[in-house]
């Protein structure tokens, strides 16, 4: 399939006075998180919230800073995520891609907004037990509590 890149805009929502950064991010479907090189985290003045132990493709583990929040913008979509500070390029993992309802288009070698929901990102929310979707229009105070754990 080759490498697929996306032009993103990254910003620090805690510091709106800072300019956003335009970056070319590699879509990495093997990664869950947004990963940022250290110089990007410094430019955005992102606060380290904690350390995270990560396992990389070669099987080795390391502790890396977890920073955030980061506002990620792609076309008409935005999301707010934490990011791992590691590597030498921006990696767009599956969590922010799903949050913004983006799809990989191998034939176009690009990331695209889901054509089934072009104006508003779609999210599927399910009960943790069973496969029934939650109908939020039918939930009332008298409804059974939903166990999200």
Language-model segments: residues:
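Pepsin/retropepsin-fold aspartyl endopeptidases
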Residues: 1-141, 146-149
